[in-house]
Amino acid sequence: MDIFKKIEREQMRLDIPSFKSGDTIKVYFRIVEGEKERIQVFQGNVIRIHRGTTNATITVRKISDGVGVERIVPLHSPLVDHIEVVSEGRVRRSRLYYLRNLRGNAARIKPKKIY
């Protein structure tokens, strides 16, 4: 059992910033097309965090042209270049699935007040 934990620790990334549900983040994906490589940015609200060792994931939701788009991001994937926290949100839940049914200004997350 100890061998598995050692291998998982070697595969984990250490450059992931701390964030929580409700925060707005930018995820920079490394896209390989043929021999070319480019970076694609996905910015949205974190609606779910699944914690784990190497299988930790987050679900990020954004509205694109009036359509809700959700993307499940494996945190320790080599295809994720880096993650950047844009702003912190004030929510009282850890899973924000209720945002899927809200439209317009009701779907906004209030910014966290820093005193």
Curated annotation (Swiss-Prot):
Q: Would the keyword Ribonucleoprotein be found if you checked this record's keyword annotation?
A: yes
Which keywords label this protein?
Ribonucleoprotein, Ribosomal protein
**Which InterPro entries does the UniProt entry name for this protein?**
Ribosomal_bL19 (IPR001857), Ribosomal_bL19_CS (IPR018257), Ribosomal_bL19_sf (IPR038657), Translation_prot_SH3-like_sf (IPR008991)
What's the superkingdom here? Bacteria
GO BP annotations listed: translation
Q: Which GO terms describe its cellular component?
A: cytosolic large ribosomal subunit
Fetch the Pfam families from UniProt: Ribosomal_L19 (PF01245)
* Gene3D superfamilies registered for this protein in UniProt: 2.30.30.790
List the GO molecular function terms.
structural constituent of ribosome
Q: Which family does it belong to?
A: Belongs to the bacterial ribosomal protein bL19 family.
**Could you tell me which HAMAP family the record lists for this protein?**
Ribosomal_bL19
Q: Name the job this protein performs.
A: This protein is located at the 30S-50S ribosomal subunit interface and may play a role in the structure and function of the aminoacyl-tRNA binding site.
- The name this protein goes by in its record: Large ribosomal subunit protein bL19
Organism of provenance: Lawsonia intracellularis (strain PHE/MN1-00)
Gene name per UniProt: rplS
